Amino acid sequence: MKKRMKKLVAIAATAAMVASVPASAVTTYAAGDDITIGVSIWSSTDVLGSQCKKIIDKAAAALDVNVMYVDQGHVSEQVTASVEQLCAAGCDGIVICNSADSEMTSAIQTCEANQVYLTQFFRIISEENSPEVYQTACNSPYYLGAVHEDEVTNGYTLVNL
């Protein structure tokens, strides 16, 4: 059972580089249970998206989990619809690259209603600019966290190259 949960957490961590799972959000899986991770991504076929897909696919194969992709083009309606689609498809967790903080309220609520774990990659909810959305995420047992690049430092470094 613990091995299957470790696989679920590991694929989410690999895909989104998530460091931890809250203790209250741990679900056990029996041996032989299939785990499916949904990936809501802007595009799985462009240069960056295809490389992300390759990494996620390799991690999924190594961990013996299934992956389902929905390309949402960073269109708000498609981002929120992708979460609904992945939940309806029976995903155990979703890794999302959303385009705006406002989309995360709906995504979190959908995941809570379906008891599906959710994490962000390449994005993070702004505590300063979106305090209500940030608090919704903090209060959710299904929101696992986010990993993103340090855009300020990256910009500074690029300017100084």
Set out the residue ranges of the language-model regions.
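A residue-level marker of the well-folded mature domains of exported/periplasmic proteins
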Residues: 2-7, 13, 25-161
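Hydrophobic core
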Residues: 13-21
